[in-house]
Amino acid sequence: MKKMLLLAILLVAAFANAQKMTTITYFQNDTLKLDLDLFEPETASKTKLPLMIYVHGGGFSGGERESGHNFCKYLANNGFASATITYTLYAKGKNFGCDGALPNKIKSFQFGANDLWLATSYFIKNSKKHNIDVDKIFVSGSSAGAETVLHGAFWDFKTMNLYKNTLPKDFKYAGLVSGAGAIMDLNLITKKNVIPMLFFHGSADVTVPFGTAAHHLCKTNASNWLMLFGSYSIYNHAISLDESASLYTYCGGGHEYSGTLFEKDQFYILNFLKEVLDGKKVKHHTVFKTGKKTDKENIYGFCE
């Protein structure tokens, strides 16, 4: 019995350490130094690895890349390379609320997306060094990180790029995972550039809309008013474009669910990634009842 227990402990310990982490500076100039933590399977792979790049949340003013460590370790233990990045927190020290300045909000999205492109560019240029399959680069993020990856995936980087020659012509990510994210314009997502996506979001989120609403539910006369299209709206748009899309709705839930699938139940994301890599087209909406009460205006039919 003692031998069995010891064996179980050793197996758990081995699994917990079945990946290696390396801290890398993926961009540096005279005023900026950006790092990432790369997690790779401990055992070298004979084939190129798919890569997930994770962007943390924090309202573009806070948060740390270390918050993505557990998610990245999980993916590394399942055969993926996975990186969590530091990025420019443009809103730090600025008013991001309804009475703030709208250009600062747009710039926050832009700087975040540009740093994501820089990290992606690093891996493309160093794909042999890290054994990365450049055709299988996924992106993911929570809250502000989700807004970063959504705009990074669908903005025209030739127009929005702050740096030269960041990504190859016609580059597309292999897929995207968004936790309580939103995008400024659904029209950015077209039949030509749409990619497989997984979303999870609380239906009563008042910080980032689940459907279509103003950011932070600001009034229309607010100086920082900006319409955003959240997970439910993007999901339906992707379905209309006949693309793979999965949505996990937490009925009655707020913004506290923005990191749920990164922190626990990570197998939902892993299954999505495997489906994409296997070339499967999946369209489904899963509803979780949280037991939380919401205002009638926030209740969707599938949450009743």
Per-region residue spans from a language model:
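N-terminal cap/lid segment of alpha/beta-hydrolase-fold proteins
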Residues: A18-T47
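Short substrate-entry loop that stabilizes the transition state in hydrolases
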Residues: A44-L49, V55-N95, V206-F210
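Bacterial Sec-dependent N-terminal signal peptides
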Residues: M1-M21, E304
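Cap/lid segment of the alpha/beta-hydrolase catalytic domain
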Residues: Y87-Q110
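Alpha/beta-hydrolase active-site loop
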Residues: P103-K128
